[in-house]
Amino acid sequence: MENTVTQCGLDVALAVVGGKWKPLILYHVRGGPTRFSEVKRRVGGISEKVLVQQLREMVAMNVLVRRDHNRVPPVVDYALTPFGETLVEALVPLCTWGNRNRAEVTEMLQREGGQEV
């Protein structure tokens, strides 16, 4: 039997927000209820299929709430839950770090493989 020891809370946080898209989605819904089409436009580069999957996962994890306004045409928006708000608060320092180090990271990534930030 394998004994798994949690080294820190980072593995727990990454289980909720891990991956390329979830932190960006959270960043773009932090200002209040946001319609699906607006999330897709703000995030940029994400397919509709992947966005639907990521939103469903975050709703299932109680990070976001999905609200269907039962109108025609359909109006659905997503908002942070109180639990999700605490997660966004935890991501703010990471965002600050990224802004502060953008030039250096961009230079390193371009030097290594031509990737842009």
What is each stretch, according to the model?
Residues 2, 80, 116-117:
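Loop-helix junctions at membrane interfaces
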Residues 33, 43, 55, 84, ...:
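Short amphipathic alpha-helical/adjacent loop interface patches that line ligand
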Residues 51, 55-58:
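Basic amphipathic alpha-helical segments that dock to polyanions
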Residues 4-50, 71, 77, 85, ...:
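N-terminal helix-turn-helix DNA-binding core of bacterial DNA-binding proteins
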Residues 27, 86-117:
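Amphipathic alpha-helical dimerization/coiled-coil segments
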Residues 3-4, 13, 62-63, 90:
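Short, contiguous, well-ordered secondary-structure segments
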Residues 59-79:
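Beta-hairpin "wing" of winged helix-turn-helix
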